[in-house]
């Protein structure tokens, strides 16, 4: 009797692994977009927490105030990465039933 339960559990684990691999691939193709400075800096990040693009409008480039542009970039990049992590956590939570399993993504 125990063998049947073990086989069933192993099949469930394998299915969850397959579902997770599929979700990771799908999330890698999804993106989040954020802006800073009223839209003068735009950052797009993937579900893999990789920066896809950074767009800077010309009015953000002031040779006398490079620090402002640097601050806008840091803000936008950090926000994009945070949003990407939240997107991944939300989607993985659906798959794992809310269980927080370290190292999933």
Swiss-Prot record:
Native species: Desulforamulus reducens (strain ATCC BAA-1160 / DSM 100696 / MI-1) (Desulfotomaculum reducens)
PANTHER family, A to Z: NUCLEOID-ASSOCIATED PROTEIN YBAB
Record's GO cellular component terms: bacterial nucleoid; cytosol
Record's subcellular location: Cytoplasm, Nucleoid
KW Ribosomal protein (keyword) present: no
Name by which UniProt lists this protein: Nucleoid-associated protein Dred_0043
InterPro entries named in the record: YbaB-like_sf, YbaB/EbfC
Any one GO molecular-function label of the UniProt entry: DNA binding
Protein origin, superkingdom: Bacteria
